[in-house]
Swiss-Prot record:
Its EC number is 5.2.1.8. Consists of 3 domains; the N-terminus binds the ribosome, the middle domain has PPIase activity, while the C-terminus has intrinsic chaperone activity on its own. Involved in protein export. Acts as a chaperone by maintaining the newly synthesized protein in an open conformation. Functions as a peptidyl-prolyl cis-trans isomerase. Residues 164-249 form the PPIase FKBP-type domain. It comes from Psychrobacter cryohalolentis (strain ATCC BAA-1226 / DSM 17306 / VKM B-2378 / K5). Disulfide bonds: none annotated. InterPro entries: PPIase_dom_sf, PPIase_FKBP_dom, Trig_fac, Trigger_fac_C, Trigger_fac_C_sf, Trigger_fac_ribosome-bd_bac, Trigger_fac_ribosome-bd_sf, Trigger_fact/SurA_dom_sf. One of its GO terms (molecular function) is peptidyl-prolyl cis-trans isomerase activity. This is Trigger factor. Keywords: Cell cycle, Cell division, Chaperone, Cytoplasm, Isomerase, Rotamase.
């Protein structure tokens, strides 16, 4: 810090500090004079040749504006220097006010939101339930059957449509004899049992044959998204064109090769599937206990969050949702109108995330936790196993500093969870593979 800069601080609250900064006016005057001389070289004033305007005229016409520019520059150049000199962990941009020339100093006040100094409560009182699961033979068989279903084909079937069959049909809907928008389609495909349509629709088609026509009566749910249809009784004329049954692929060499199995047959596929499921269990269990631990800690720690921090988190979550939209609908995230996603939509989750970030940072600081590089290497290696060329992925995460920093942040957060679990009480509960993965999916959707 420049030795001629004077700074005093006044802590307004746990999340805000005010600095009074004094800069010697001589520093400003020197810069003002320098700029006036620069302006004089090119200034054009009637009655004088370019470069020959008297300095008194330059000061009279440009002096006030130049002085204000210099003051703004000096404030911009010194405010962060002042914040740093006081070891203040600022959040967001400082708010400058009360700027004045006083005696031999430029004096201004900078109000800045600060990272809250939270005394984390309840670390030794945490009680969480840690879910665990095992992969049995039936789970592996079910997963392989799901792999088959992902590549299922439908072949024509003679007879009535039953659960699992795919039906191709035309339909025409009406309410009180009047057609309505979106109520008709041709060559519509529906798998019986998929619950894709409103209640009663599939039941009306089940049992029909190709070439058969009939009218079914259904009632739109009260909470149906189209308000003009909610709770209304409707009639649909159905014309079935084709009934097909599912045909799963045989587990032969061609099928095995789809999953990278060239040797070892079905047993090798089962072994690969089991290992992948065990990785999923490990990740899901880790995610579950982390969520439970953080939830328990948040219940015991409520505090105000700096507005800038909350706004940053809201914007981060909004951008994440827009990215999901772009992936889902195949559009550029920039094409979505942000006004469709108001702050209120994210405030609750953003406040939780901001508080959690502060708590985690305080635990790291107070307990002196440092990232375990061996765990970082293990994390990268395990993540790379999911790719066709693990070595390429490992090299990417090893050489890209930003990506490695992201992983280090995740690993350090895991270390915080480990520390918290060691201080608290954990009870293990075994659940099924399906329940554990379903809970993880619900957790991710809520984020």
């Amino acid at each position: 810090m420049a030795t001629d800069l004077q700074v005093t601080t006044n802590k307004l609250s746990n999340k805000e500090t005010q600095l009074t900064v004094k800069v010697p006016v001589e520093k400003i005057q020197n810069k003002v004079e320098g700029r006036i001389r620069q302006v004089a070289k090119t200034a054009k004033i009637d009655g004088f040749r370019k470069g020959n305007v008297p300095m008194s005229h330059i000061r009279s016409q440009y002096g006030a504006g130049i002085q204000q520019e210099v003051i703004n520059d000096v404030i911009r150049d010194t405010v962060f220097e002042a914040i740093k000199s006081e070891d203040i962990r600022a959040v967001g941009m400082p708010n400058i006010d009360d700027v004045k020339l006083e005696d031999d100093f430029l004096v201004y006040q900078a109000t800045v939101e600060i990272f809250p100094e939270v005394d984390v409560q309840g670390i030794n009182e945490i009680e969480v339930e840690r879910h665990t699961a095992k992969v049995d033979e039936a789970d592996v068989d079910t997963m392989i059957e799901n792999l088959q279903k992902q590549r299922e084909e439908f072949v024509e079937k003679k007879g009535k449509a039953d659960k699992g069959n795919q039906v191709t049909f035309d339909f025409e809907g009406s309410i009180d004899g009047e057609k309505f928008e979106g109520g008709s389609a041709e060559d519509f495909k529906l798998v019986i049992g998929s619950n894709q349509m409103i209640p009663g629709f599939e039941a009306g088609i089940k049992g029909m044959k190709a070439g058969e026509e009939k009218t079914i009566d259904v009632t739109f749910p009260e909470d149906y998204q189209a308000e003009n249809l909610a709770g209304k009784e409707a009639q649909f004329k159905i014309n079935v064109k084709l009934v097909e049954k599912s045909k799963l692929p045989e587990i032969d060499d061609a099928f095995l090769e789809l999953f990278g199995v060239k040797e070892g047959g079905v047993e090798k596929l089962k072994d690969d599937v089991r290992k992948n499921m065990e990785r999923e269990i490990k990740n899901a269990a880790r995610s579950q206990v982390k969520q439970a631990t953080f939830d328990a800690l948040l219940e015991k720690n409520e505090f105000d969050v700096p507005n800038a921090m909350l706004e940053q988190e809201i914007e981060r979550q909004r951008n994440m949702m827009m990215q999901r939209f772009s992936q889902q609908f195949g559009a550029n995230a920039d094409s979505f109108d942000k006004d469709m996603l108001p702050n209120e939509l994210f405030e609750e989750q953003a406040l939780r995330a901001a508080r959690l970030g502060i708590i985690v940072a305080r635990v790291i600081d107070t307990k002196g936790l440092e990232v375990d590089q061996a765990r970082v290497e293990t994390f990268i290696k395990e993540a790379a196993e999911n790719y066709e060329d693990p070595s390429e992925v490992i090299e990417y995460y090893t050489t890209d500093k930003q990506q490695r920093a992201n992983i280090e942040s995740v690993v350090l957060e895991d270390q915080v969870v480990d520390y918290l679990i060691e201080q608290g009480k954990v009870t293990d509960k075994e659940v099924s593979y399906q329940d554990l993965l379903a809970a993880q999916q619900q957790q991710q959707q809520a984020m």
